[in-house]
């Protein structure tokens, strides 16, 4: 399966909001990430049943700027979206068993996220 999201990738963790809930701090994703996640929904296909068997996840991130970014945070945001929008049942190691080939590159004119899911 191949999914292309033609939007500049955004991480989930770098600029979160801390709110108090019943006396305990809770970290919420930043507004830019929340907007990114909503925009991405239209590019993620709907599956009848989420994938629940081992896969290799390969993601190519093409960033709009050369600013340093954390590939781990990008990958976590992508996995969370794939679970939220019903592509993956979960993002634990029994389903996402490898992430071979994931990379970050620069493409000012065409920032995007290319997701490749291959069943093992």
Language-model features: locations:
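Acidic, proline/glycine-enriched N-terminal capping motif
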Residues: 1-120
């Amino acid at each position: 399966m191949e999914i292309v999201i033609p939007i500049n990738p955004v991480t989930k963790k770098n600029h979160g909001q801390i709110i108090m809930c019943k006396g305990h701090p809770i970290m919420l994703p930043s507004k830019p990430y929340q907007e990114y996640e909503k925009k991405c929904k239209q590019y993620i296909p709907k599956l009848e049943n989420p994938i629940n068997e081992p896969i290799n996840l390969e993601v190519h991130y093409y960033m709009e700027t050369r600013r340093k970014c954390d590939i781990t945070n990008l990958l976590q945001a992508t996995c969370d979206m794939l679970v939220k929008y019903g592509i993956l049942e979960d993002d634990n190691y029994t389903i996402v068993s490898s992430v071979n080939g994931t990379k970050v590159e620069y493409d000012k004119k065409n920032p995007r996220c290319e997701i490749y899911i291959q069943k093992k």
